[in-house]
Amino acid sequence: DDTNRALEALARAARSRVEATIIGVTGSVGKTGVKEAIFASLERASRGAAHRSTRSYNNHVGVPLSLARMPARSRFGIFEMGMNHAGEIAGLTTQVRPHVAVITTIAPAHIENLGSMDAIAAAKAEIFAGLEPGGTAVIPADSEHSAALERAARDVGARVVSFGRARSADVRLLDAIPSANGGSLVTCEFPEG
């Protein structure tokens, strides 16, 4: 208990010493891949001034350590947040205090602990509670829980951006072609057309 409180204090102190734009990522699957893709883009754009959580350091120990390792000169920080039970992401997001909160997907991971898909969606939506004022929530438009996620984000005053194949998505995936290097060539439609 004292160790956990010390880690939380470390996380809060580490977060308060940086002026970086912070991105938090959660979801039932795809957290690490999305975190790494965001990092690769921002690392290149910022000429090395981006930081990310190491591996899958996404719990009550890993998140504080990842925050503590973030250089003060960082322009961007990307942090993965995972959970097994309701309430865990709420604790992590208040440490991370993201400007952008991303939910990759809602799937039956940890359903044995949460009991229903609705409960999983609610637990993932906890990430919005830590959003900085004026923050942005990025949600999966293809999820049957997208309306609930959008409500949760709007309840904290977040700007909402949805993504996916759904016609209603703000950023709509039109095509994805696997490439020889292991990536994919994607075609997306943005709000401007």
Feature annotation, model-predicted:
Residues N4-A141, A147-V156:
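Phosphate-binding loop of NTP-binding sites
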Residues M117-A121, R151-G193:
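Adenine nucleotide phosphate-binding catalytic loops in nucleotide-utilizing enzymes
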